Amino acid sequence: MKRLSIIVIIGIFIITGCDWQRTSKERSKNAQNQQVIKIGYLPITHSANLMMTKKLLSQYNHPKYKLELVKFNNWPDLMDALNSGRIDGASTLIELAMKSKQKGSNIKAVALDHHEGNVIMGQKGMHLNEFNNNGDDYHFGIPHRYSTHYLLLEELRKQLKIKPGHFSYHEMSPAEMPAALSEHRIIGYSVAEPFGALGEKLGKGKTLKHGDDVIPDAYCCVLVLRGELLDQHKDVAQAFVQDYKKSGFKMNDRKQSVDIMTHHFKQSRDVLTQSAAWTSYGDLTIKPSGYQEITTLVKQHHLFNPPAYDDFVEPSLYKEASRS
């Protein structure tokens, strides 16, 4: 009887071991078969929803894809990687993406990255009523000429009744702007967070205007995906956008958004807390009306001929995704 019991126990161990090995092999095989999605970004609050998406994905037992976030330090390098197909998508300036589409790049915008979160900074102690047509030109830093930040400054110039040409612009990476302001190389800058809050924290800058006060809820950054991913792996793209949509509503929880940014960005928690107060997420649908506002401004400022909404935006993935 004792011998029989030992044989039974050994048999159970053998069967269990085989099952464990089979399960382990199946998991390994599933991991190998997962589609890897490479998404480019700059370390700004506008891209933080990607980090929340990656965190959400890590909580799944059987994720449908792998998300690889690829960090860039400037917009030209990011767009070169996107347009050449070295990455599958990006969180990028909407105007840059529109220009790439107009030039023939195989990309589509599927969702916004954020709402608000843009500032116009000036030297500490500066006031808007100091701007006039009598003095020297005013030199501002912008991340790129094809950006909502350029449009915000040009619209502010018009609101202040400053003649064209009195605002000059210098393209620089967002991270360079607070130092350039401190060194008086520029009189101000327009940029994404957290570099507005950082400028104030360093004691050299002052927020002259929030973007919303110049152009209410102007679209700024969008999530774009390459056509190859959308055409050849539609189910994977849908799963990614599903998680991205869920994460956008999670980002409206201020503590969660600050936690995720503190984990991924270099700035202090105080700076990122201020940035989070100026940036919102939630519903990230690219609406025709919001897109039309940007295309109108792009045309008014003679930047380029923008693509039509239907040519540039693929709204169905975000629309069909559940928020919970």
Label for each model-derived stretch:
Residues I44, F72-P76, S91, P143, ...:
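Soluble non-cytosolic domains of exported or imported proteins
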Residues G125-N133, K161-P164, E228-A237:
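Short helix-loop capping/hinge motifs at secondary-structure junctions, enriched
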Residues E26-L160, H170-E171, I187, V191-E193, ...:
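Short, glycine-/small- and polar/acidic-enriched structural segments
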Residues K299-S324:
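Conserved C-terminal helix/tail region of periplasmic/extracytoplasmic solute-binding proteins
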Residues E95-L96, H170, A175-I260:
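Pocket-lining segment of extracytoplasmic ligand-binding domains
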Residues D19-R22, Y65, R145-G165, Q242-T273, ...:
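Ligand-binding clefts/hinges and TM-proximal coupling segments of bilobed small-molecule sensing domains
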Residues D231-N305:
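Secondary-structure end/capping motifs
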Residues M1-V36, R323-S324:
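Short, low-complexity disordered leader/linker segments with a strong preference
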